[in-house]
Amino acid sequence: MAPPGSRTVLLLALTIIARTQALKPTHYLTKHDVERLKASLDRPFTSLESAFYSIVGLSSLGAQVPDEKKACTFIKSNLDPSNVDSLFYPPQSSQALSGCEISISNETKDLLLAAVSEDSSVTQIYHAVAALSGFGLPLASQEALGALTARLSKEETVLATVQALQTASYLSQQADLRSIVEEIEDLVARLDELGGVYLQFEEGLLETTALFVAATYKLMDHEGTEPSIKEDQVIQLMNTIFSKKNFESLPEAFSVASAAAALSQNRYHVPVVVVPEGSPSDTQEQAFLRLQVTNVLSQPLTQATVKLEHAKSVASRATVLQKTSFTPVGDVFELNFVNVKFSSGYYDFSVKVEGDNRYIANTVELRVKISTEVGITNVDLSTVDKDQSIAPKTTRVTYPAKAKGPFIADSPQNFALFFQLVDVNTGAELTPHQTFVRLHNQKTGQEVVFVAEPDSKNVYRFELDTSERKIEFDSASGTYTLYLIIGDATLKNPIHWNVADVVIRFPEEDAPSTVLSKNLFTAKQEIQHLFRDPEKRPPTVVSNTFTGLILSPLLLLFALWIRIGAKISNFTFGLTIIFHLGHAMLAMYVYWTQLNMFQTLKYLAILGSVTFLAGNRMLAQQAIKRTAH
């Protein structure tokens, strides 16, 4: 039979798997993250570009540069009226500063108008159009749209398309912007999905992804149509953009700030972030749940309404509470369920945020733990005669006291422990996950642990029969201290109770000769590795005799040459000597006396090369001599 609580553990595991499959915001900007992002943007100005990133980025987060007058002076003093890119940054920055007005000459205006051409890059067209709009100068939107569309057909990069979206947001609503708006759907198709949680462009640049989100919602707010992005895709983009918390690059910090502002303040999609205030663990003394409901910038959505759809027990899946509204308390929403009798355990709370049709990811699942205190009742210690000839001797003990006198468990009689566990707050019966009986030998330190299991009436019973349990105890008789251990993740007061002393006696023939304390953590005996002894080499006489036999054919060859009067004058002695000195026989001899196989092969490779070259050269010279004769 499965131990108590195994069914609950199984249901808990299945619920966690099901819940993790739901797409929800996993990354957003906490208040600490927002301050850190502001610090990344608040840097000394080194150029018009850096000033633009700092001023406009901080403005997106609802902040201002420390010295606006100084910032305005810096912008005016660094403006280059002959450079289109330089003219893009000042008007955008000045609009985020109070009392900073910048004007340009007619020549500069003509320069910007000339840049809105098919011959210019998408970046230059974007900068020129944004500059003209920022300076409040008129622009032929339809002509600019034609130049932008023509140029975009030649630049098909993701960044160029994003800049086209940014450009279109400055053009008149009277212009037909459909061709640019359709690019949004194409860009969404080019996004790569990572693990079903993130969406990003193939290049993996966070800056490009963030600028795409900011440009899309700015254009759609300007155009007045909902973007062709699914709500799940918005959440995936959000998870990607806000997954990074530290920024060394000023443009990257600016892009994240722009995306955060767009996702917090647009007409179509506002992701909702629901975070429990503190740990979502509630007790019977504090039966309430507080939630922070914010946008991606951790700004409270105080106008929202928060409702509990249902609260279900993880173990039984029974609905214990449903259709209940949270109460706004300052910047948080509070649910008080003091009048609802929750038994201890885990519950899934389904919470829905309403009040604005722009809200997305507005239904969340929260795992709430209801904790309680466990009480031990009806604790009986009994000595039971095996043949039932003597009535059981029962002693009742009250937690946390220890029973008086030792109890005996031996061959004629067994020892038994009975108890019940209840919820102190509600009086309901409890079956914690961990209920153990621990027996500790007072002399040797040996420990034996058993699991106490409840019966059909939830009465826990532990019985010790020495004849059946002698293996666990190694037949070690002695006085054991009995502890009751009760624990569970939902219990505020785990229990380790010294209940009584039990004298356990095993038959003498079963007792070990020496009772040793079992310590599982002592050092084990060192393992000695035995390697095979090297083979003995043959005696010197044997090796010398074998060497002589090997050399005998060579000596016989020399003797036969002398007898037949071989003419050795035709040999080229230099090469011949080298050829014969390189003979492999020498290597074979050394192999026999000194080397192993691998060393011999290495030397043979060297000798073989020299021998081959010398022999080849020698034979070639012999052939030349024969030809000459």
UniProtKB/Swiss-Prot annotation:
Top-level taxon in the UniProt lineage: Eukaryota
Keyword terms: Endoplasmic reticulum, Glycoprotein, Isopeptide bond, Membrane, Signal, Transmembrane, Transmembrane helix, Ubl conjugation
Cytoplasmic membrane side: 563-570, 616-629
GO biological process, one term: protein N-linked glycosylation
Residue ranges, Lumenal side: 23-541, 592-594
Signal sequence region: 1-22
Entry-listed glycosylation sites: 106
Cross-link (Glycyl lysine isopeptide (Lys-Gly) (interchain with G-Cter in ubiquitin)): 154
Pathway assigned in UniProt: Protein modification; protein glycosylation
Topology class, membrane: Multi-pass membrane protein
CC terms in the record's Gene Ontology section: oligosaccharyltransferase complex
Compartments, record wording: Endoplasmic reticulum; Endoplasmic reticulum membrane
The keyword Metal-binding appears for this protein: no
Ranges that cross the membrane: 542-562, 571-591, 595-615
Main location: endoplasmic reticulum
Description of how the protein assembles with itself and partners: Component of the oligosaccharyltransferase (OST) complex. OST exists in two different complex forms which contain common core subunits RPN1, RPN2, OST48, OST4, DAD1 and TMEM258, either STT3A or STT3B as catalytic subunits, and form-specific accessory subunits. STT3A complex assembly occurs through the formation of 3 subcomplexes. Subcomplex 1 contains RPN1 and TMEM258, subcomplex 2 contains the STT3A-specific subunits STT3A, DC2/OSTC, and KCP2 as well as the core subunit OST4, and subcomplex 3 contains RPN2, DAD1, and OST48.
PANTHER family to which the protein is assigned, alphabetical: DOLICHYL-DIPHOSPHOOLIGOSACCHARIDE--PROTEIN GLYCOSYLTRANSFERASE SUBUNIT 2 (PTHR12640:SF0), RIBOPHORIN II (PTHR12640)
Family assignment from sequence similarity: Belongs to the SWP1 family.
Primary role: Subunit of the oligosaccharyl transferase (OST) complex that catalyzes the initial transfer of a defined glycan (Glc(3)Man(9)GlcNAc(2) in eukaryotes) from the lipid carrier dolichol-pyrophosphate to an asparagine residue within an Asn-X-Ser/Thr consensus motif in nascent polypeptide chains, the first step in protein N-glycosylation. N-glycosylation occurs cotranslationally and the complex associates with the Sec61 complex at the channel-forming translocon complex that mediates protein translocation across the endoplasmic reticulum (ER). All subunits are required for a maximal enzyme activity.
Name of the protein in question: Dolichyl-diphosphooligosaccharide--protein glycosyltransferase subunit 2
